[in-house]
Design a protein with these regions (language model features):
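The feature captures the beta-strand-to-loop junction immediately N-terminal to the Walker
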Residues: 43-45
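Helix-to-loop junction immediately C-terminal to a conserved catalytic motif
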Residues: 58
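ABC-family P-loop ATPase nucleotide-binding domains
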Residues: 90-148
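C-terminal coupling/interaction segments
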Residues: 8, 249-297
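Conserved ABC transporter NBD signature motif
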Residues: 66-77, 83-84
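Catalytic Walker B motif of ABC-type/P-loop ATPase nucleotide-binding domains
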Residues: 161-165
């Protein structure tokens, strides 16, 4: 499901003209390039298409149209699925491990399918994450199951690490260790991480590439700094916000002490000293973008 594409001389994950219909839902004309060496956050409201996109990257479903390429490999070519699997670590929403086997047994069972699986690394991560290698996978909590699958994914020495909503079931203490592990994984500079999430604040400080989906459509794909340059939150007295160019306003709503709007940035930091201009957080952007067309002004 991929083709060879280069960005700055480096191979990457690439989707071109991808469409996928699942019942009434449709992923529409998605074209993205995720460079090697980046931590990419895939964001969007529930049912925006994040999991469908990840399944196509993993070869678990195929696009109706378009191509998906990983490291120059296309799933349609003979043996490519095995080669892609060998360089891809997966931490899915659904459970992949056998509930009746211990964590150690699961590692030995599934590790056979990866040429670089290292049991000693798997054991090190299980210990770091506070998991007993002898316990059956089915006896773990939801958060512990994700930790176990995360430990296994890391033990296969992947080039691409793909995680679907991993932090939703983590306790607060582990979330920091999770971020530390991701940063350690990236130290070589030749790997990439894709994290699908609708819980945004804890990932903001490590992400350097962003893909935002809304109702199956691609809203933004690019580096995080370009995203921060592109949009602004403007707050102030309602009549002053109404003076902004209407075509720049994505969504605005009246609040108790004025109006708050998400706008396309065209130098609004210099517009009026009475207006407060800030860079939107991902959470603010998602909130306002999901309500576009409902502006109160």
């Amino acid at each position: 499901m991929c083709k060879t594409v280069f960005w700055g001389g480096r191979r990457m994950i690439s989707l071109s003209g991808v469409n996928k219909r699942l019942g009434s839902f449709r992923l529409k004309d998605i074209s993205i390039e995720i460079p090697d060496g980046y931590i990419c956050e895939l964001v969007g409201q529930n049912a925006s298409g994040k999991t469908t996109l990840i399944k196509m990257i993993l070869g678990l479903c195929r696009p109706d149209d378009g191509t998906v390429v990983i490291d120059g490999l296309n799933y349609q070519e003979a043996e490519s699925d095995k080669r892609i699997r060998d360089i891809t670590g997966i931490v899915p929403v659904n459970e992949l491990m056998n509930s009746e086997l211990s964590l150690l047994e699961n590692g030995r069972c599934y590790g056979r399918f990866y040429s670089r699986y290292d049991e000693s690394i798997y054991m090190e991560y299980l210990e770091r994450f506070g998991l007993d290698r002898k316990i059956k996978f089915g006896k773990l909590s939801k958060g512990q199951k994700i930790k176990a699958q995360f430990a296994f994914a890391l033990s296969t020495a992947p080039k691409y690490l793909i995680l679907d909503e991993p932090t939703a079931n983590f306790d607060i203490d582990f979330k920091q260790d999770f971020l530390n592990v991701i940063m350690q994984f990236m130290e070589s500079g030749k790997k990439s991480v894709i994290i699908a999430s609708h819980i945004l604040d804890e990932l903001d400080r490590i992400v350097d590439y962003l893909i935002y989906l809304d109702k199956g459509e691609l809203v933004y794909s690019g580096d995080i700094e370009s995203f921060r340059d592109k949009y602004r939150i403007i707050s102030g007295e309602s009549y002053k916000v109404k003076l902004l160019k209407q075509e720049d306003i994505i969504h605005a709503e009246d609040r108790k002490y004025g109006t708050k709007a998400l706008v396309v940035n065209h130098g609004y930091s210099k517009y009026d000293g009475a207006l407060t201009v800030t860079v939107p957080t991902l959470e603010e952007f998602m909130y306002h973008y999901s309500k576009r067309g409902e502006s109160a002004i």
